[in-house]
Amino acid sequence: MPGLTIGDTVPNLELDSTHGKIRIHDYVGNGYVILFSHPGDFTPVCTTELAAMANYAKEFEKRGVKLLGISCDDVQSHKEWTKDIEAYKPGSKVTYPIMADPDRSAIKQLNMVDPDEKDAEGQLPSRTLHIVGPDKKVKLSFLYPSCTGRNMDEVVRAVDSLLTAAKHKVATPANWNPGECVVIAPGVSDDEAKKMFPQGFETADLPSKKGYLRFTKV
């Protein structure tokens, strides 16, 4: 069966967490949620990642985005491990919930399984991160192996891109950062673009002369 991917609705699972029972759709509500998995508690890369998430929590909060972690460890393990996370990065308070999936059924439904990483109980979660929108659908996914920690600056940049695209009906080019030019979707005619973007736009002069690469500011 194909795994959860961009455009799919996230299963409305209910799981125990460090903040009590959580039903995913209720947690998403009318906003955006970063739903991320880690292979295991009390492991080195995961400790640095969840500390980084805690460090960046205010950046996500400013954008109206909530965090939600998950792994196959139990709630008590998550709570004990949180002490290590916060000690590793003093000032990094883990305020977001971490869900428990001891039977690993949720990580399978969320397409968060690492086929190459196992323990005595079975396959472990990968470093998967889904950005879920208000419609409960996956807007973007990152998938990393256990050996590679995530880059939080790129997660923030991806969130900014999604929010900008949703608000202004544009797309963001390679290496884009907030404040830089965005591109106009090819389905928008020049006449429509003039109405949508009264500030104007520039069309790149390319050999094909197709006029499809148009930049504007929002």
Swiss-Prot record:
EC number(s) given by UniProt: 1.11.1.24
User: Which residues does the Swiss-Prot or TrEMBL record annotate as the active site?
Assistant: 46 (cysteine sulfenic acid (-soh) intermediate)
Q: Which organism is it from?
A: Triticum aestivum (Wheat)
Top EC class for this record? oxidoreductase
List residues of the Thioredoxin domain: 4-164
Keywords for this protein? Antioxidant, Cytoplasm, Nucleus, Oxidoreductase, Peroxidase, Redox-active center
Residue ranges of the motif Bipartite nuclear localization signal? 194-217
Q: What is this protein's record name?
A: 1-Cys peroxiredoxin PER1
Q: What is the lineage of its organism?
A: Eukaryota, Viridiplantae, Streptophyta, Embryophyta, Tracheophyta
